Amino acid sequence: MPDTAPARLPLVGLPPAAELGRLLAKRSAPIKAVLLDQSLFAGVGNWIADEALFQAGISPHRPARDLSPAEVGRIRRALHAIVALAVKHDADSSRFPKSWLFHQRWEYRGDLQTSRGESIVRETIGGRTAAWVPTRQR
């Protein structure tokens, strides 16, 4: 049965972590694909989903239903913080923190690495390209 709740806006409409956890517990798809579902998370695009999972330390492959309450809380906080900062800086990516995965995920030559030298893997998850760091995201 489809969820009839309205889509959640990351800056103003995310439910409390416990409610978000109940919503995610109904989803068997990888968390990356769930975050890109616009009927659930309006406005969360590919780079925001990758960045939130990177900052939360969560593998994009993890089934949404398997996330712990602490992990759901980390994803929720990351989504809110990323969107709040992007809005604050009028989406001027040159003003985003240099530690963000965002700055390296767009490179298409050579071995991709984070600002800390960690390898970035690029693969398709849920029909979309995902950039993630296996040594940091579990």
Predicted regions and their residues:
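Phosphate/anion-contacting hairpin/loop surfaces
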Residues: 1-55, 75, 126, 133-134
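Acidic-enriched, low-complexity/disordered segments with a strong bias for Aspartate over Glutamate
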Residues: 3, 37, 50, 66, ...
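Accessory alpha-helical DNA-binding modules that contact the DNA backbone or grooves
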Residues: 25-29, 50, 54-87
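Short, local alpha-helical segments
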Residues: 34, 61-65, 97-100
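C-terminal accessory segment of soluble enzyme catalytic cores
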Residues: 83-138
